[in-house]
């Protein structure tokens, strides 16, 4: 079962927040923004409940997220949440490899690249504008 980690979000400029307070934003908002930046599939959407919880954050002037999300979050949203065991994933992967050999070769090379790239990712999201910055 894929584990989801919440990135720590610091709100700057929100009138009701003290300077030393740190707020946690639901994973859905961060993943929604990362889908444009980091190449997640466009159909990977967060549940409506998560987005409703983040509604009060739209009043903030700036939203800064610093942290890195594990690779299994991308796999979780790319293939659907709710995998119960590794056997189901192996069976589905074996079926895909048998059907499309080139796709499995690309998946293996992508996994090798991901294993070699474990540097923490730092990203900054600014609410209310199209400015987004992704630094590795």
Swiss-Prot record:
Keywords: Nodulation
Designated name of the protein: Nodulation protein K
């Amino acid at each position: 079962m894929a584990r989801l980690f919440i990135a720590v979000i610091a709100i700057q400029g929100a009138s009701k927040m003290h300077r030393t307070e740190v707020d946690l934003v639901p994973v859905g908002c961060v993943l929604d923004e990362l889908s444009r930046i980091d190449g997640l599939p466009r159909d990977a959407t967060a549940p409506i409940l998560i987005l409703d919880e983040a509604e009060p954050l739209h009043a903030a002037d700036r939203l800064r997220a610093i942290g890195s999300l594990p690779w299994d979050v991308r796999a979780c949203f790319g293939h659907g949440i709710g995998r119960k065991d590794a056997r189901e994933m192996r069976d589905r992967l074996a079926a895909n490899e048998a059907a499309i050999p080139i796709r499995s070769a690309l998946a293996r090379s992508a996994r090798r690249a991901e294993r070699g790239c474990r540097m923490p990712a730092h990203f900054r999201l600014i609410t209310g504008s199209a400015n987004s910055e992704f630094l590795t």
